[in-house]
Amino acid sequence: IGAASVFGQKIQSNNYGTTGYVNADGKIQDASYRTVGYIKSDGKIQDNSYRTIGYIKSDGTIQDASYRTIGYIKSDGKVQDASYRTLGYVKSDGTVQDASYRTLGYAKGVDKTWAAVVFFFFFFNG
């Protein structure tokens, strides 16, 4: 499935403020280094209590905890909802944009699938 290329890559807002971190082991932390969840190498998405809250399939399909498809992450970085409406894009340089190409933030060095899960599917927004 994906991985952060370097331990502790920053997730940043569009004004470069740090909003969190994605570690190479899949741990997702907020800006205060509190663990908010995990993305496992098998695609399982877990909250901070290790409860499974979703799945990333090898083909880029994103599912909720009940295996309902909620979106897709295409190989080119396009992110779509379950109805194939474009939500945004994760560019190869880590820039994350909405469907109108406005920059939402940055996830440089973070696998685009993981970045899409954090920015578009809100698994870790409590």
Positions of the model-derived regions?
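Long terminal segments
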Residues: G2-T35, S41-G43, R51, S58-G60, ...
